[in-house]
């Protein structure tokens, strides 16, 4: 095992074998106001 990547594998990579996926929106982080409201609601 060598630490160097095998460039032959990379150059032979077939992009057509990849599946097309639907991009999902990432969850945005809550704002400070939202966090404070949740803290007060649970307190």
Curated annotation (Swiss-Prot):
Plays an important role in the organization of the cytoskeleton. Binds to and sequesters actin monomers (G actin) and therefore inhibits actin polymerization. Residues 1-43 are annotated as: Disordered. This is Thymosin beta-12. The keyword Cytoplasm applies. It is found in: Cytoplasm, Cytoskeleton. Keywords: Acetylation, Actin-binding, Cytoplasm, Cytoskeleton. PROSITE patterns: THYMOSIN_B4 (PS00500). Pfam families: Thymosin. GO terms for cellular component: cytoplasm; cytoskeleton. GO terms for molecular function: actin monomer binding. The modification N-acetylserine is found at residue 2. Belongs to the thymosin beta family. GO terms for biological process: actin filament organization; regulation of cell migration. Residues 1-25, 33-43 have a biased composition (Basic and acidic residues).
